Amino acid sequence: MKNFDFIIVGGGTSGTITSEKLIRNGYKVLIIEEGKKNNNPLLSMPAGWIPMLDGSPYLKFYKSIPQPQLNNRQHDIAQAKVLGGGSSVNGMVYMRGKPSDYNRWAEATGDERWGWNSLINNYKALENNQRLAGETHGTDGPIKVSDPGYVAEGSNLYIKTMQKLGLPYNRDFNDGNQYGVGLMQYTIGDGKRCDTVSALINPLLNDKNLEIMLNTVVIKLIIENKKAIGVETISNGKYEKIYGKEIILTAGALITPKI
């Protein structure tokens, strides 16, 4: 019977970041991911994510309920189904949330660690920014962040037009002030996508404290005395029960509540 310190349900962006931190602190971690490895060359190419949008094995689509505000239309909602989650298939735009959003988290939880002044330290620790530095940016973290290598003329014209309409130029949308117009940065380094697998998990693949189960779905939590002590999974038609001291659900906004 397998037993772990932590079982991470969902090997997406938050799941892989959480796993890396736990493993570096000496804990035995199991990552359970419904999708595949993110080793398709197209995934690492900055322009390769576009062909992945249609019929991709790395995405799973859900249908929304009818939306009254949109004339009752239903919309497809894409969720990553691959190790690394959204960091493996997204458009690579590096954009933090607004400070006011994080401060509302701190207010709602009564925990200042969820506030902007605290979380900015986590962002800095993760970031390896190739242009920006200072109080709000990191330059030696694992996640590479860079300016766009090519800027379409239409983008330059748009920026000039918005400036003529009175919007200020913003050289950094991630320093706490997101007002204005400018160019965004991307999680790209050395011409390749910098996802959480290549940056955080691949360096730990030989670590005895890391185990990864791919193509595996968690169908329910195992509860004993009102505490989650494990998960029941299915993979290729085979059911398995796996136990851990703590279960962390990082299966995305749609699947985490479902579990």
Regions found by a protein language model. Give the residues of each.
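Glycine-/small-residue-rich beta->alpha transition segments that form the dinucleotide
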Residues: 12-13, 34-37, 217, 244-246, ...
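Alpha-helical support elements that line or immediately flank enzyme active sites
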Residues: 106-110, 253-259
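Short, hydrophobic alpha-helix immediately C-terminal to the catalytic nucleophile
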Residues: 16-20, 198, 257
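Core beta-strand elements of the Rossmann-like FAD/NAD(P) dinucleotide-binding domain
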Residues: 2-4, 237-246, 250
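Short beta-strand segments that buttress and anchor functional surface loops
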Residues: 230-234
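N-terminal glycine-rich phosphate/pyrophosphate-binding loop and immediately adjacent elements
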Residues: 1-124
